[in-house]
Regions:
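Serine-hydrolase catalytic machinery in alpha/beta-hydrolase-like enzymes
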Residues: 33, 39-42, 56-136
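Primarily recognizes the serine-hydrolase "nucleophile elbow" in alpha/beta-hydrolase
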Residues: 134-135, 141-187
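Bacterial N-terminal signal peptides
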Residues: 9-18
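Loop/turn elements at helix/coil->beta-strand transitions in domains of secreted/extracellular proteins
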Residues: 57-60, 88-93, 139-142, 164-168, ...
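A domain-start/cap signature at the N-terminus of enzymes
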Residues: 20-60, 91, 121, 150-153, ...
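The feature captures the conserved acid-bearing segment of alpha/beta-hydrolase catalytic domains
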Residues: 168-244
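Bacterial N-terminal signal peptides that target proteins for export
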Residues: 1-9
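Cell-envelope and extracellular/periplasmic
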Residues: 64-68, 148, 159-160, 174, ...
Length: 259
């Protein structure tokens, strides 16, 4: 089944924890950074265009990957899985890459690492968003961040600190509960938290993050499923539907509907 295929693919990735694409440095001597199923936008940045949603809106998802080891081609598993989801659910997915540190590619989760690495990360994401819109020839109606595993811990911090100008977050298999708003008047983008209840490593962290959002009176939704350390496609579908609903409702659209 399709649900099982994405689950198995991303579980494997976690455990290891525009013309034609050209090779990007860092993918290995004989491997480009971007897989055949996605397109290279710039060095270590890929994308897949799944087209508009069923109602014609253009959705951009910025995907913050789970831990990647430096083995050439290892990143392809997550790229391919999200590219399939983009086609199935009608969105464009942008794949930035975290900094390369001692043991692989990880997003910064400590305050010290964020202070050192975050300015370049955020600037790179903003450049890539603009370049992608130019490449495709259209702007996006809504932009959401999806963070998985290492990317979930970082995305949760970005959300609470309102560090990116986006319309919502989907945080899967992880979450940091220590971050606090830097500006009480900053935009509070809604957050969907998917708790992988069968993952002993992250379930408690995800629940704690949801508790932090509740204490902050943040717009959020939390859902638990008996799944392990993976990007569950049910979480992704539910989170995307909810965020799309929130965005349409915020625009006062009569067709917002309930997710």
């Amino acid at each position: 089944m399709r649900s099982r295929s994405i689950a198995v693919a991303l579980a494997v990735a976690a455990l290891g924890l525009v013309a034609a694409p050209r090779p990007a440095t860092g993918g290995g001597a004989d491997k480009p950074w971007c897989s055949d199923e996605v397109v290279e936008l710039s060095d270590h940045v890929c994308y897949a265009d799944g087209g508009p949603s069923p109602n014609g809106r253009r959705t951009l998802i910025v995907y913050l990957h789970g831990m990647l080891v430096a083995t050439p081609g290892f990143q392809y598993v997550q790229q391919r899985a999200l590219a399939r989801e983009a086609k199935a659910r009608g969105f464009t997915v942008l794949f930035p890459t975290s900094p390369l540190v001692k043991d692989g590619y990880f997003w910064p989760t400590s305050a010290a690492a964020q202070k050192e690495q975050e300015p370049a990360i955020l600037a790179g994401i903003e450049r890539s968003r603009a370049a992608l819109a130019e490449r495709l020839g259209h702007p996006f109606d809504e932009t959401f961040v999806v963070g998985f595993s290492s990317g979930a811990y970082y995305a949760s911090s970005l959300a609470v600190r309102s560090a990116l100008d986006v319309d919502g977050y989907i945080v899967l298999a992880g979450g940091s509960s220590w971050a606090r708003p830097a500006d009480a008047n900053a935009k509070r983008a809604p957050v969907y938290v998917g708790v992988s209840a069968s993952d002993g490593q992250t379930a408690t962290h995800s629940r704690s993050f949801a508790g932090t959002l509740a204490a902050l009176h943040w717009p959020y939704r939390v859902e638990e499923r008996p799944v392990g350390h993976l990007v569950d496609d049910v979480f992704l579908a539910h989170g995307l539907a909810w965020l799309r609903y929130r965005k349409r409702a915020s625009e006062g659209r009569s067709d917002a509907g309930a997710p």
